[in-house]
Swiss-Prot record:
Zn(2+) binds at residues 96, 99, 118, 124. Belongs to the TRIM/RBCC family. Residues 188-250 form a coiled coil. Pathway: Protein modification; protein ubiquitination. The gene is Trim21. This is E3 ubiquitin-protein ligase TRIM21. GO terms for cellular component: autophagosome; cytoplasm; cytoplasmic stress granule; cytoplasmic vesicle; nucleus; P-body; ribonucleoprotein complex. It is an enzyme of class 2 (transferase). InterPro entries: B30.2/SPRY, B30.2/SPRY_sf, Butyrophylin_SPRY, ConA-like_dom_sf, PRY, PRY/SPRY_TRIM21, SPRY_dom, TRIM/RBCC. It catalyses: S-ubiquitinyl-[E2 ubiquitin-conjugating enzyme]-L-cysteine + [acceptor protein]-L-lysine = [E2 ubiquitin-conjugating enzyme]-L-cysteine + N(6)-ubiquitinyl-[acceptor protein]-L-lysine.
Length: 470
């Protein structure tokens, strides 16, 4: 067997080793799996894209995250392609296209292979010329260095690509888990709300049945007494119409019966229908709209003292040394929040502990600051207040509020687009105090605070903006 035949058979064997058993083509970006078999990157990713799968060669299980680039096979493919290309071009590449002479020198300055005729020409005569073999060796070493750097970069890029693929998979799994958790939490919350609704309705039905039973009992008693009364009236009328002897017969007994008769009052306690209806999770849901409020010193009445963090305000004993600007309230101990709202949902809480008087709510940014005015929606105020032990809403006319548990903290919720301002008694499980609906805001809103006058000395406590508590 001739050397050329042996070389040909060796090349065929090498081509078989670098052929992908999936696509039957030379491997592109060869990747090794746990069992040691190697395949095209795209082919093996297609096999294992749905999770764990088995090797097409030996059926052993493998995972995509354990794939590793096979540089040995990649180099073999590149070398075999280069051999095939060199075999085809060897004749053309070894001789000068211009002179037909063998190329045996290399011009360093021009980076060009030369024959002996080219080397003697004026263009290359004064340039550095080295033998082809020597130049090839030098540049081969340089290319090897560059190749090694590029291969390491490619390996890093492939690893990063695989890491990103795994991150994408992990992220999607985490998102799906979080979605399931959110669905479960809201399903539970809806279930609790439905149960509480049923409990409240059942309690109301029970109160209704008991009240109607008592009314029925009283009606029966009243009918019985009415019948007895009618009989007594008829007896007395008969005696009056009769003879004197008949009139006097047992007259003392009849009069005693008539004098002792009385009609009981309808003393029935009606169910309390003004009591609050607790809604589970209301405070937590409201606090998802929480905004951090601070006080605007430029709007504060000159009697007010505002804390350093601008989260508390109280009535002072003397005027503060402040400028009388157009934003400042002049007649009442009022101050606005620094924040302005023209859209969205907002919620904050105010501590009114130990306060005997206060006003809270929101107002238009453009409200009157000087002189006397009333707090009403017509004047751009949506507020509730405590004054002389009475809670009221600033409607026209004012609305008396029946609050079962005196609040220590008030929650204020604004839905700008819906035109709603609601107040909640945080002390009483977040029960609703009052809601202004269908409000026409017509411009930016600001939080509103009135600490109330301290005539008796019992209203010195500050209004405090509460920190967020989830």
């Amino acid at each position: 067997m001739s050397p050329s035949t042996t070389s040909k058979m060796s090349l065929e064997k090498m081509w078989e080793e670098v052929t992908c058993s999936i696509c039957l083509d030379p491997m592109v970006e060869p990747m090794s799996i746990e069992c040691g078999h190697c395949f095209c990157k795209e082919c093996i990713f297609e096999v294992g894209k749905n999770g764990g799968s088995s090797c097409p060669e030996c059926r052993q299980q493998f995972l995509l995250r354990n794939l590793r680039p096979n540089r040995h096979i990649a180099n073999m493919v590149e070398n075999l392609k280069q051999i095939a290309q060199n075999t085809k071009k060897s004749t053309q590449e070894t001789h000068c296209m211009k002179h037909g002479e063998k190329l045996h020198l290399f011009c360093e300055e021009d980076g060009q292979a030369l024959c002996w005729v080219c080397a003697q020409s004026g263009k290359h005569r004064d340039h550095t010329r080295v033998p082809i073999e020597e130049a090839a060796k030098v540049y081969q070493e340089k290319i090897h260095v560059v190749l090694e750097k590029l291969r390491k970069g490619k390996e890093l890029a492939e690893k990063m690509e695989m890491d990103l693929t795994m991150q994408r998979t992990d992220w999607k799994r985490n998102i799906d888990t979080q979605k399931s958790r959110i669905h479960a939490e809201f399903a539970l919350q809806n279930s609790l709300l439905a149960q509480e609704e049923q409990r409240q309705l059942q309690r109301l039905e029970k109160d209704q049945r008991e009240y109607l039973r008592l009314l029925g009992k009283k009606e029966a008693e009243l009918a019985e007494k009415n019948q007895a009364l009618q009989e007594l009236i008829s007896e007395l009328e008969r005696r009056i119409r009769g003879s004197e002897l008949e009139l006097l017969q047992e007259v003392r007994i009849i009069l005693e019966r008539s004098g002792s008769w009385n009609l009981d009052t309808l003393d029935i306690d009606a169910p309390d229908l003004t009591s609050t209806c607790p809604v589970p999770g209301r405070k937590k849901m409201l606090r998802t709209c929480w905004v951090h409020i601070t006080l605007d010193r430029n709007t504060a009445n000159s009697w007010l003292i505002i804390s350093k963090d601008r989260r508390q305000v109280r009535m002072g004993d003397t005027h503060q040394n402040v400028s009388d600007n157009k934003e400042r309230f002049s007649n009442y101990p009022m101050v606005l929040g620094a924040q302005r709202f023209s859209s969205g949902k907002m919620y904050w809480e105010v501590d009114v502990t130990q306060k005997e008087a206060w006003d809270l709510g929101v107002c238009r940014d453009s409200v009157q600051r000087k002189g006397q005015f009333s707090l009403s929606p017509e004047n751009g105020f949506w507020t509730i207040w405590l004054w002389q032990d009475s809670y009221e809403a600033g409607t026209s006319p004012q609305t008396t509020l029946h609050i079962q548990v005196p609040p220590c903290q008030i929650g204020i919720f604004v839905d700008y687009e819906a035109g709603v301002v609601s107040f909640y008694n945080i002390t009483d499980h977040g029960s609703l105090i009052y809601t202004f609906s269908e409000c026409v805001f017509a411009g930016p809103l600001r939080p509103f605070f009135n600490v109330g006058f301290n005539y008796s000395g019992g209203n010195a406590a500050p209004l405090k903006l509460c920190p967020l508590k989830m």
